[in-house]
Amino acid sequence: MAHPESRSRAQGMTRRELAAVVDHTLLRPEATLADIDRVAAEAVSFGCASVCVQPSAVARAAEVVDGRILVCSVVGFPHGASVSRTKADEAATVVALGAAEVDMVVDLGALGDGDFAAVAADVAEVRAAVPSVVLKVILESALWSPSVLRQATEAAMGAGADFVKTSTGFHPAGGASIDAVSIMSSVVGDRARVKASGAIRDTATALAMLAAGADRLGVSGTGAILDGLG
């Protein structure tokens, strides 16, 4: 169940307030430097929390935003199938290039096996590599039963995640859902935060995710969503 403050925060939210909880995202692998320049500049103009880009685009995005907002990047994306050491190295690399937040994809196979110790170990290795940045752990929530999602959230949080995140936006199972956000929010309580991403394409959905307990949104169509607030 969403906290009452989550519901009240979403009601009457201003354009500026909504932008401040958005990671303006461009993760298409074919994105060009011109695309990165555009999205990074948009994120600054909107007043977003961050611009979220692929590792190869971090340095360029950091140059464009020039410290005015944060740069976020992804690790083990989108499948989560890299070994933990590789994820840790990738995380350290993107931080060195200018990322202040890291969104890692957890070992989805381990989740499917119910091996929550392996899930925690995967997260812990990345956490150890980048101890001073915000770490968000992508669980690909559409794949799992409520029970597995709860246990995955606990495992990620226990291993040092600052956020648990619903989705990559690339899996055919789907993106964020109100039910998944509500479950994840109920587990984390005040100990961590929730990022909803994937299939958030309009203002009503964005506000519903926040009302369900999301603290951050990952979206690509930020301008249209903000325009829904006038």
Predicted regions and their residues:
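Conserved N-terminal beta1-alpha1 strand-loop-helix module at the mouth
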Residues: 2-97, 150-151, 155-158
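C-terminal alpha-helical cap/extension of soluble enzyme domains
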Residues: 1-22, 28, 46, 190-230
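Conserved anion-binding
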Residues: 80, 91-92, 101-163, 167-170
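Glycine-rich phosphate-binding active-site loops on the catalytic face of alpha/beta enzymes
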Residues: 73, 77-78, 96-111, 158-174, ...
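Conserved, mostly hydrophobic/aromatic
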Residues: 23, 61, 94, 137, ...
